[in-house]
């Protein structure tokens, strides 16, 4: 997780509503947020709140402008369009998931 200041796991009550291109609203749970010194941005990773724990979930990632509490809100989410930036986000996610798996085994 080089080049990242911190990773903050999402709290149970941290949810964001996203609206798709058809105008449908879907509630997402915040998995975690982190900052990148290389890109000078904050990032949030989300998964659908409707998914059960035993299902494989599709995780969505966005850059965001933190509010006064340092949190993300749906109005301040921006798509990640750069391949190198995506690679960095995937590396952070994979490290987070590997750490989470090792904590479950302890």
UniProtKB/Swiss-Prot annotation:
It comes from the Bacteria. Pfam families: DUF1292. InterPro entries: UPF0473. PANTHER family: UPF0473 PROTEIN CBO2561/CLC_2432, UPF0473 PROTEIN CBO2561_CLC_2432. HAMAP family: UPF0473. Belongs to the UPF0473 family. This is UPF0473 protein LCABL_08490. It comes from Lacticaseibacillus casei (strain BL23) (Lactobacillus casei). The lineage of its organism: Bacteria, Bacillati, Bacillota, Bacilli, Lactobacillales.
């Amino acid at each position: 997780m080089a080049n990242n200041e911190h990773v903050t796991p999402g709290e149970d009550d941290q949810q964001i509503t996203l609206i798709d291109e058809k105008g449908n609203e879907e509630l997402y749970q915040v998995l975690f947020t982190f900052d990148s010194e290389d890109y000078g941005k904050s990032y949030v990773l989300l998964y659908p709140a409707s998914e059960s724990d035993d299902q494989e979930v599709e995780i969505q990632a966005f850059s965001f402008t933190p509010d006064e509490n340092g949190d993300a809100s749906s109005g301040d989410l921006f798509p990640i369009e750069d391949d190198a930036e995506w690679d960095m986000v995937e590396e952070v996610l994979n490290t987070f998931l590997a750490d989470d798996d090792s904590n479950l085994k302890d």
